[in-house]
UniProtKB/Swiss-Prot annotation:
This is Large ribosomal subunit protein bL35. The keyword DNA repair does not apply. SUPFAM superfamilies: L35p-like. It holds the Pfam family Ribosomal_L35p. Keywords: Ribonucleoprotein, Ribosomal protein. Transmembrane segments: none annotated. The lineage of its organism: Bacteria, Bacillati, Cyanobacteriota, Cyanophyceae, Synechococcales. Belongs to the bacterial ribosomal protein bL35 family. GO terms for cellular component: cytosolic large ribosomal subunit.
Length: 66
């Protein structure tokens, strides 16, 4: 059986936490930040756990991470 390939685009966007859940970065934090208040910018800086319905898809894209 051949080795499974990792989706490199997914590998750059997700990392796996200690308890086996995928972590992602939030959107809307790259530019056009001057009209967003500090609270919103701070919240957008926090990493987010990938939703449980998408965890299975991330797991397929990163076969050796879990």
């Amino acid at each position: 059986m051949p080795k499974l390939k990792t989706r490199k685009a997914a590998a750059k966007r997700f990392r796996i936490s200690g308890n086996g859940k995928a972590i992602r970065r939030k959107a809307f934090k790259n530019h056009l930040l001057q009209h967003k208040n500090a609270t919103r910018r701070r919240r957008l800086s926090q990493p987010e756990v990938v939703h449980e319905t998408d965890q299975e898809r991330v797991k397929l894209m990163l076969p050796y991470s879990f």
